[in-house]
């Protein structure tokens, strides 16, 4: 009798823990970013990072190669200088612990203007796994792609490696290495190395970057110190630049567990020179940033500020121009969480556009943004809506309304959304729909469709009102996967298309 009781209690505890995990929200709204947790979703194992990103209201599949044009892709907050389309379509959601969609991180990350960050935190396996993949593109141009990806996890060391080569009107080579070393429970070191080499008809370019991030936890309360050092060199046919940087950041509870503080210093120094002229531009930034978050069971309040001391030196021949000034990015946000499924956000953000090197006068332009957002999430259903109003100094004020929804049922997932942009010069909109069917015998069929109204910038540039991509994949056993994408399919039927981009891309992948 005793043994069955023990077994029954064990099953009850297991089911309770599983219910608690499934009850956690897929989406978590923070003051300056939205967190997505793929491990809390119902996954088949074949979902990609690109599939998950279609849940976000602001992100759109604007083209086969133009996926996240407004976002800088990072892994553990380090820029990932790789083939973006390949990474998004190859990285599996089951290997991702957390996705941070950082749309207003001017305080925490020092983003400039409308720039945004897409930060990926990996879920490392207990051993080595990865894949080797080859692709062939057949359309107006013929393309060949080779890629290899590896993940390795152990108690003290994690390793992520990705390399790819693309031949299409030139050569593109990418390499990314990321290692995590855990020395003990309170000390870890993250190191990064990325390299890209592009040999295109318009010239050659290369970029090399190295970075190290050291974390030390002082106590059981979670007081943590972060130290960062890095260097990047970039060069193309017209210019070259050097960018060393350093960061020191402290994250800690303050007086009470409900109040969290981030205090940091960042220094970066960008030195750019033109190869065909005597023009050069050096920018030196020294930032101090401070942010407080006070969390109650149903409310979260955040206020932050980044004071940016900068000096710009521009030289052209014997003429030089210098400007030193101070500016500050700021945010203030309140989030109401009535229960674990619903979240409502109201926020204010101030940020700046940097002047371009080619501008005659160095002048910053400020951006003031108001944001109202709502998120609802369950394991198989998410709904997100967002309204933003931008007041842009020296530019046109803009209102953006966005909505997206994700629904998963047995054998089928549906993702859709819409974006509306309202300005004095005109109104434009887009509507997108992306269903995926998981069929018997390891078949998968997916479709991406995006419709643009007449005044939408993407439609004006391409002449095509609809973007479409049809994908078919088949898994053979544990190791082999074959797929084909027919992308930009509506270009073939549109007489107004400026460039006929429709093509078939065939993929063969071996997993180990």
Segments predicted by a language model, with ranges:
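Short strand-turn segments of transmembrane beta-barrel domains in outer membranes
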Residues: 42, 126-150, 163
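N-terminal periplasmic accessory domains that precede
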Residues: 49-52, 86, 111-134, 146
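Outer-membrane beta-barrel "beta-signal"
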Residues: 333, 373, 498-512
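Short acidic/polar hinge/loop motifs at secondary-structure boundaries
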Residues: 78-105
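Transmembrane beta-strands of outer-membrane beta-barrel pores
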Residues: 135-140, 154, 165-169, 193-199, ...
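Flexible loop and strand-edge segments within Gram-negative outer membrane beta-barrel domains
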Residues: 168-247, 281, 353-355, 360-364
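Surface-exposed extracellular loop regions of Gram-negative outer-membrane beta-barrel proteins
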Residues: 124-129, 180-188, 192-195, 262-270, ...
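Repeated loop/turn-to-beta-strand initiation elements of outer-membrane beta-barrel proteins
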Residues: 128, 156-160, 185-191, 219-225, ...
């Amino acid at each position: 009798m005793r043994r069955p009781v023990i077994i029954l209690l064990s099953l009850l505890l297991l089911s309770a823990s599983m219910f608690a995990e499934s009850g956690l929200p897929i989406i978590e709204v923070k003051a300056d970013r939205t967190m997505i947790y793929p491990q809390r979703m119902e996954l088949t194992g074949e979902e990609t990072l690109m599939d998950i990103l279609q849940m976000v209201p602001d992100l759109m599949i604007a083209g086969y190669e133009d996926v996240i044009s407004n976002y800088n892709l990072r892994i553990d907050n380090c820029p990932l200088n790789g083939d973006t389309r390949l990474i998004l379509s190859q990285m599996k959601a089951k290997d991702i612990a957390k996705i941070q969609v950082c749309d207003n991180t001017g305080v925490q990350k020092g983003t400039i203007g409308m720039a945004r960050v897409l930060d990926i935190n990996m879920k490392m396996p207990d051993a080595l796994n990865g894949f080797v993949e080859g692709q062939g593109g057949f359309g107006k141009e013929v393309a060949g792609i080779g890629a290899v990806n590896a993940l390795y996890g152990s108690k003290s060391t994690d390793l992520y490696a990705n390399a790819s080569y693309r031949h299409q009107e030139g050569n593109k080579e990418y390499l990314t290495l990321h290692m995590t070393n855990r020395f003990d429970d309170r000390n870890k070191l993250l190191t990064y190395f990325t390299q890209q080499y592009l040999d295109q008809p318009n010239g050659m370019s290369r970029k090399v970057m190295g970075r190290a991030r050291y974390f030390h936890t002082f106590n059981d309360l979670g007081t943590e110190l972060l130290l960062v050092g890095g260097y990047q060199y970039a060069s193309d046919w017209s210019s070259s630049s050097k960018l060393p940087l350093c960061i020191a950041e402290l994250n800690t509870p303050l007086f009470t567990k409900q109040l969290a503080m981030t205090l940091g210093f960042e220094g970066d120094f960008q030195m750019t020179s033109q190869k065909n002229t005597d023009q050069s531009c050096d920018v030196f930034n020294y930032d101090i940033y401070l942010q407080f978050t006070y969390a109650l069971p149903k409310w979260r309040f955040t206020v932050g500020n980044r004071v940016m001391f900068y000096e710009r030196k521009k030289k052209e021949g014997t003429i030089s121009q210098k400007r030193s000034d101070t500016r500050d990015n700021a945010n203030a946000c309140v989030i109401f969480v009535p229960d674990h499924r619903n979240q409502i956000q109201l926020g204010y953000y101030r940020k700046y556009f940097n002047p371009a090197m080619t501008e005659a006068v160095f002048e910053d332009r400020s951006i003031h943004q108001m944001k109202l957002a709502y998120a609802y999430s369950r394991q198989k259903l998410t709904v997100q809506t967002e309204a933003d109003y931008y007041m842009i100094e020296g530019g046109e004020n803009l209102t953006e309304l966005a909505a997206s929804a994700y629904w998963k049922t047995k054998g089928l997932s549906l993702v859709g959304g819409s974006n509306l942009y309202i300005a004095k010069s005109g109104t434009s909109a887009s509507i997108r729909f992306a269903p995926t069917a998981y069929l018997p015998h390891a078949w998968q069929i997916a479709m991406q469709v995006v419709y643009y109204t007449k005044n939408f910038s993407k439609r004006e540039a391409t002449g095509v009102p609809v973007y479409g991509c049809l994908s078919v994949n088949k898994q053979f056993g544990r190791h082999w996967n074959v797929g084909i994408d027919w992308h930009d399919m509506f270009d073939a039927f549109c007489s107004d298309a400026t460039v006929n981009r429709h093509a078939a891309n065939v993929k063969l992948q071996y997993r180990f």
